[in-house]
């Protein structure tokens, strides 16, 4: 596992959850002796929706809603076997989507 790299992508609607989860991953990787780059904050995706409040007239009366998707990127440059085992056993919050890629 000396020349490999682990890239972890995190997505969440709550920025506190994603920061907490990324901190847990970084601490776990550093504890096992791996070199870590990140967490790198990626651009936040904002989806905005405008909804008419009135069913018939009053087009000026609208409600506005938005969904923010926060993303973080963590690179583990020199993972050890202990690092992979520790990351597999790590229990993260339910509101965080985790994608792991080996490269």
Swiss-Prot record:
A single GO cellular-component term from the record reads: ribonucleoprotein complex
Query: What keywords are annotated for this sequence in UniProt?
Result: Ribonucleoprotein, Ribosomal protein
Asked if the Swiss-Prot or TrEMBL record annotates the protein with the keyword Protein biosynthesis, the reply is: no
GO MF, one term, reads: structural constituent of ribosome
Q: One Pfam annotation, family name?
A: Ribosomal_S10
Q: For this UniProt entry, which residues form the secretion signal?
A: none
> InterPro entries per the record?
Ribosomal_uS10, Ribosomal_uS10_CS, Ribosomal_uS10_dom, Ribosomal_uS10_dom_sf
Q: Sorted alphabetically, which SMART domains does this protein's record hold?
A: Ribosomal_S10
Record carries keyword Chloroplast: no
Assembly, per entry: Part of the 30S ribosomal subunit.
UniProt family annotation: Belongs to the universal ribosomal protein uS10 family.
The entry's function note states:
Involved in the binding of tRNA to the ribosomes.
Q: Which HAMAP family match?
A: Ribosomal_uS10
Annotated NCBIfam families = PRK00596.1, rpsJ_bact
Q: How is this protein named in the record?
A: Small ribosomal subunit protein uS10
Which species is this record about? Acinetobacter baylyi (strain ATCC 33305 / BD413 / ADP1)
């Amino acid at each position: 596992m000396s020349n490999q790299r682990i890239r972890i992508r995190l997505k969440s609607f709550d920025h506190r959850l994603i920061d907490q989860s990324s901190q847990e991953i970084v601490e776990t990787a550093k504890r096992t002796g791996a070199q870590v780059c990140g967490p790198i904050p990626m651009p936040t995706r904002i989806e905005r929706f405008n909804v008419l409040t009135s069913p018939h007239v009053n087009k000026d009366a609208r409600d506005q809603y938005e969904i923010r998707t926060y993303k973080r990127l963590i690179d583990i440059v020199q993972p050890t076997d202990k690092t992979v085992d520790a990351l597999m056993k790590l229990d993260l919050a339910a509101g965080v989507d985790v994608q792991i890629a080996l490269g």
